[in-house]
Amino acid sequence: MKRFMKLTAVWTLWLSLTLGLLSPVHAAPDTSVSNKQNFSTDVIYQIFTDRFSDGNPANNPTGAAFDGSCTNLRLYCGGDWQGIINKINDGYLTGMGITAIWISQPVENIYSVINYSGVNNTAYHGYWARDFKKTNPAYGTMQDFKNLIDTAHAHNIKVIIDFAPNHTSPASSDDPSFAENGRLYDNGNLLGGYTNDTQNLFHHYGGTDFSTIENGIYKNLYDLADLNHNNSSVDVYLKDAIKMWLDLGVDGIRVDAVKHMPFGWQKSFMATINNYKPVFTFGEWFLGVNEISPEYHQFANESGMSLLDFRFAQKARQVFRDNTDNMYGLKAMLEGSEVDYAQVNDQVTFIDNHDMERFHTSNGDRRKLEQALAFTLTSRGVPAIYYGSEQYMSGGNDPDNRARLPSFSTTTTAYQVIQKLAPLRKSNPAIAYGSTHERWINNDVIIYERKFGNNVAVVAINRNMNTPASITGLVTSLRRASYNDVLGGILNGNTLTVGAGGAASNFTLAPGGTAVWQYTTDATTPIIGNVGPMMAKPGVTITIDGRGFGSGKGTVYFGTTAVTGADIVAWEDTQIQVKIPAVPGGIYDIRVANAAGAASNIYDNFEVLTGDQVTVRFVINNATTALGQNVFLTGNVSELGNWDPNNAIGPMYNQVVYQYPTWYYDVSVPAGQTIEFKFLKKQGSTVTWEGGANRTFTTPTSGTATVNVNWQP
């Protein structure tokens, strides 16, 4: 959804007030810890569980797997869920303004110590799973996990779990004794291992060279045993496992390696979550510096999950850390991503994480990190702070970027930057939901405005550490008043004076200076800021967040279909819960009209699914093509494009599982229904349909299936 809104020209009498006096801060349902669908009002703190705090030494691994000194960063160091609980209870996280934590994958991992190039390695990171239905005992018991959920919720903190359904653990096709042979267990019962895989639980196509999307999906990541999601047992197992963690009360899911799993299976996986207990879900698809991937944005817009915004992270690092781009490049990223993401405010923004060098360098200027944090916390999206950033941790690539947290100081400037800015996401909807507009710029300085209705925040950053910036001609949407810097001057910010028409008085922004000024007011007409989940079947309750909905029930529209009465589960001024009506599957615009009939903005790209989803692999043989021509699939349901060649599924693959002239693709389709479908060849705008009658297939009610047919001339 594009959130550029018209500026208003309604001005008040001259006031010398800060925002705190202009508008009192009050709790709203959209900002509640119970809102599992919307994280735009939250600040996430990513915790590598083993490296955060050791709250229970009794659960530390023994022998070669453990290094209490944390000298070998590839061994366990002792961090656990009790340690996180302790740091919630003592106020370290809440004092920083953190309202969501993202923890390492909680499932049971392998116990083997693997020697790579003379260095012992363990599953301290949580990504070498063996049983997705049990806990990693080094982190804690199932009761410890429940205690973490309860403690976090009692302190208004949501809990996101990492989840890695792409693979189990390292394995060797030649040596079944290597590590644990990638074995997969179901609550303690062995399902199978990588060698002698008679049940076809895993892929066996060798390791990926990352040359194509297909190559990365169906071949192993390094030596990790790659799960076969087209296997019904694997499919049902993983979906049952995530339901178990949802039942335990998790509020969000980060899905690892989404680029390396079938997109159709992932859509059915998301449908399972959204049709069961929907929570905010985001995936990891790595992008390099200056990389813009159409497939990346298509996944974000069509899979039902958001993404870690690597495009944002890489550009922020270029501009604030490495000085390899300037503020015009930053502006271009913000404006370009606004177009490419259907819901830009749902993407998870960050400046570093466990898969890249830490932002701060050992001898680097701390102000660079502080400015990057301020930028992330006030920009569109859902900000995620990597543990230790507030303590200026440095470190190169894995494992040096995963060291033990050295301190829990609450007096660092970085901690205080987070502390002062994080609450804005709940108190000012311009930060949570607003559009972004550049208001003043040169190579080293950017002043941008976030705006939602008449709520406004203005952010000024001068990355030049030696030269002040003379700011003249600045015009904002702030009302006529004098505004104190929300940061309180800790980054050398200043007061901003705004006159008639939003014109700011000239001022000097100090070298390395950063300031935030804001204004809030109540909305009198409805404005939608967030909808979640963005994909589900009829009858599922979704959450609409925003402002100005009023206290009495109005109407929610899915396209032209009006929903009123009992199908509106709850209606408050900042949040509506509504059941998806019984409309045909497809893409819909959502809008709201309050009880007085005032209409909201349109929130677009909502997908109504035809029903519950399963994954079907469609295989077409003998489909020869000309150079530049590809094979696609369409059919009579929205999941297959409703017979529209422009919305057909594909291009299909033809290199790994099957080879040309056989093509294949894994597709999410309605469960337990007889569907019609056909294949077609496309080259640009030229479409060639296969002959014969429409094909039919009755999909399974659960699990997966394969359709294997020949091209009809």
UniProtKB/Swiss-Prot annotation:
Positions contributing to Ca(2+) 1 binding: D54, N56, N59, N60, G78, D80
Region (B): 166-229
InterPro entries: A-amylase/branching_C, A-amylase_C, Alpha_amylase, Carb-bd-like_fold, CBM20, Glyco_hydro_13_cat_dom, Glyco_hydro_b, Glycoside_hydrolase_SF
CBM20 domain sequence ranges: 608-713
Site (Transition state stabilizer): D355
A1, as annotated region: 28-165
Cofactor(s) it depends on: Ca(2+)
Keywords, alphabetical: Calcium, Disulfide bond, Glycosyltransferase, Metal-binding, Secreted, Signal, Transferase
Stretch list, region A2: 230-433
SMART domains reported in the protein's UniProt record: Aamy, Aamy_C, CBM_2
UniProt catalytic activity: Cyclizes part of a (1->4)-alpha-D-glucan chain by formation of a (1->4)-alpha-D-glucosidic bond
Active site: D256, E284
Origin superkingdom: Bacteria
Segments of this protein annotated with the region C: 434-522
Region (E): 610-713
Disulfide bridges in this chain: C70-C77
Subcellular location: Secreted
Signal sequence, start to end: 1-27
Family according to the record: Belongs to the glycosyl hydrolase 13 family.
Protein name as it appears in the record: Cyclomaltodextrin glucanotransferase
Organism whose genome encodes this protein: Bacillus sp. (strain 1011)
Gene: cgt
